[in-house]
Regions:
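Primarily membrane-embedded glycan-assembly and transfer machineries that use lipid-linked glycans
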Residues: 1-161, 185-302, 352-356, 362, ...
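Alpha-helical transmembrane segments and their cytosolic interface
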Residues: 295, 303, 334-337, 437
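Transmembrane helices and adjacent periplasmic/lumenal helix-loop junctions
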Residues: 165-182, 294-304
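Transmembrane alpha-helices and membrane-interface helical segments
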Residues: 95, 99, 147-158, 182, ...
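Juxtamembrane/interfacial segments around transmembrane helices
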Residues: 48-60, 169-175, 224-226, 243-253, ...
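Aromatic-enriched
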Residues: 313-391, 398-401, 448-450
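Repetitive helical segments and hydrophobic/amphipathic motifs
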Residues: 393, 398, 402-403, 410-417, ...
Length: 450
């Protein structure tokens, strides 16, 4: 059933691409392919494409390293690149869902048919969330970058994790925020190596095309207006939300600074409220913070909302009051695509001022993030009842200091199902449930599979 749903979603998307008038839009993919063809010419950042967006000719806005990565694509027919990009994005989305579930339930559980079915089903659903829909429409790179971050978090090898994040940041600066995740997990060497790899991408392009590298990092970096209209409803960052409320670009002024500090404080305490082994929870707190404080966070940048929904449904706080409400909120907002709908009600993408109700509706993502942080702080503390142990995660895979015999295994009494005890996964026989109190902290993992 789940495989059929995913297949139907893929076929529907292909039909959308092939048969609808604007199906082969791929405006951003055109910029990647045609813009990168100028790599090394000295005119990379002079390129613009206005064929689909006459009100805003799209420039190449990524670092020169991204152009180097995309450069080989311009040798292929664009139709081949587009279809391949679409199918690769579906595969990457499936990888994102799979890794999100694996970070919560463990590698062994993902071998079970139930969890494989859940991964396929959520991939089928995820294809129709607005951030993913827009990623398909524009031919954006976001799903691939999210996948790189997820693989980096899953890996316990410092140089692999650091290389993946450093390369992702070299392609598009925003994944650099993943370094905060490594700091939160006390993976200091990984954080340092990711920064070194990122600067290595800059050094490489400086050797190949020093003029373009200098121009990007000395002149263009930080120019949000070159990326697009800050006040557009599609910009769901704090800067975009606040600008729409006050009617002008707040830039990085006092109002933005206060909002960013409040967000940072809430993100910090939300992280502190999580269980020490909740890697996915930590990751989404960090990534949502990055989306909030970035000058521009288009609605299609918010791919991370799919892992957020999965974490609310299957994560360690899934039974806390409000978890289903928040999951439902994000599902409704992303399936409808509220920022996308609001785009039809603005005079132009350059108009910042708008009626108050549209400003509030245009803040759905920012409001949702702040509500999520506050909910995590409350629910995490109620569940834990004591400060969370923030010891380093650098311990052998399969070890668990709070588990029987020091490993992820329940006592050998009787039964045979996987169980979950206070946030830990145990692979082994299920103990007899002798009391109602014990039942309240032990839950068969199978119970929570779609």
């Amino acid at each position: 059933m789940a495989a059929a749903a995913l297949g139907t979603s893929v076929l529907a998307r292909l039909a959308w691409v092939l048969f609808l008038p604007n199906g082969m839009n791929f405006v951003d993919l055109h910029v990647y392919v045609d813009g990168s063809a100028n790599f090394g010419s000295g005119h990379l950042f002079d390129y613009t494409d206005s064929s689909k967006t006459p009100d805003f000719p799209l420039p190449f806005t990524y670092p020169p390293f991204a152009a180097l990565v995309f450069y080989p694509l311009h040798f292929l027919p664009f139709s081949v690149v587009a279809i391949g990009w679409l199918l690769a994005t579906v595969a990457a989305l499936c990888g994102v869902v799979w890794l999100a579930l694996e970070l919560m339930v463990g590698t062994a559980a993902m071998r079970e048919p139930n969890w494989r079915t859940a991964a396929l089903a959520w991939t089928a659903v995820g294809m129709w969330l607005e951030p993913v829909r827009s990623t398909f429409d524009y031919g954006q790179v976001n799903v691939f970058l999210v996948l790189l971050a997820m693989v980096a978090v899953r890996s316990g090898v410092w140089w692999i994790s650091g290389t993946l994040v450093g390369v992702a940041a070299g392609i598009k600066l925003t994944p650099a925020v993943t370094g905060l995740y490594f700091a939160a997990r006390k993976r200091w060497i990984t954080a340092i190596w990711s920064a070194a790899v990122f600067f290595g991408t800059i050094g490489l392009t400086y050797l190949l095309t020093p003029g373009e590298t200098n121009k990007y990092f000395r002149e263009l970096l930080g120019d949000a207006h070159r990326i697009g209209p800050v006040g557009s409803s599609s910009n769901q960052s704090l800067r975009g939300v606040l600008s729409r409320f006050v009617g002008h670009d707040v830039v990085s002024g006092p109002l933005w600074i206060v909002a960013a500090l409040v967000t940072a404080v809430l993100a910090f305490f939300a992280w502190r409220a999580l269980a020490s082994d909740d890697r996915l929870g930590t990751l989404i707190i960090v990534q949502l913070f990055g989306l909030m404080v970035s000058p521009i966070s288009w609605s299609h940048h918010w791919i991370w909302l799919l892992p957020v929904i999965l974490w609310l449904v299957y994560g360690p706080l899934r039974q806390a009051a409000g978890a289903r409400v928040l999951a439902g909120y994000w599902l409704v907002v992303t399936l409808i695509g509220v920022p996308w709908v609001l785009g039809f009600f603005q005079d132009s993408i350059w108009t910042i001022s708008r009626p108050g109700v549209l400003s509030w509706l245009g803040a759905v993502d920012a409001i949702g993030v702040l509500a999520l942080y506050i909910w995590i702080i409350r629910s995490g503390r109620l569940r834990n009842g004591r400060p969370v142990d923030r010891s380093s995660e650098q311990q052998p895979i399969g070890r668990c200091n709070n588990c029987y015999d020091g490993v992820n295994r329940a006592p050998n009494i009787r039964g045979g199902r996987d169980i979950r005890l206070r946030g830990y996964d145990f692979r082994g026989p299920q103990p007899a449930l002798a009391s109602r109190e014990l039942r309240s902290v032990i839950h068969p993992t199978r119970k929570f599979v779609l």
